[in-house]
Amino acid sequence: MAQIPPSLQDLVNRFNQVQAQLQNVLLRKQQYEAELREIEKALTEIEKLPQDAKIYKSVGNFLIPQNRDAALQELRERKELLELHTKTLARQESLLREQIEKLREEINKELSRLKGSVETAKGGG
């Protein structure tokens, strides 16, 4: 069986690394999106409450009382931060997908080139 040329092995290694980075980005993005949905639900429910409603915030194993406006402000700030992170991850996802496509093309070119040189060697021998 023929040895895989180092150039092709490098391309495959880079492809696998970028693929792993993409999986990591997708996982983090999914986690942020899930947290965003939870925050949006919480905002909707808290906004329905009267101004003097008792609200508790979970901190570790404790429930800490918090006023409605402070809870809303904290949730809105967290939502804004998560939206920013999600947009950043979406850009990273797009760039990584482009890199994967370029690497896939390079790998296919290298494989075609190798296949051609093997067939030439067999036919010329």
UniProtKB/Swiss-Prot annotation:
UniProt keyword Cytoplasm present: yes
GO molecular function annotation: protein-folding chaperone binding; unfolded protein binding
Primary residence: cytoplasm
Keyword Translocase attached: no
Organism whose genome encodes this protein: Pyrobaculum islandicum (strain DSM 4184 / JCM 9189 / GEO3)
Keyword field: Chaperone, Cytoplasm
Localization in the cell: Cytoplasm
Gene3D superfamilies tied to this protein: 1.10.287.370
Similarity-based family: Belongs to the prefoldin subunit beta family.
Gene that this polypeptide is encoded by: pfdB
Protein name as catalogued: Prefoldin subunit beta
Gene Ontology CC: one annotated term: cytoplasm
Record's function text: Molecular chaperone capable of stabilizing a range of proteins. Seems to fulfill an ATP-independent, HSP70-like function in archaeal de novo protein folding.
A GO BP annotation: chaperone-mediated protein complex assembly
Coiled coil: none
Subunit structure, interactors included: Heterohexamer of two alpha and four beta subunits.
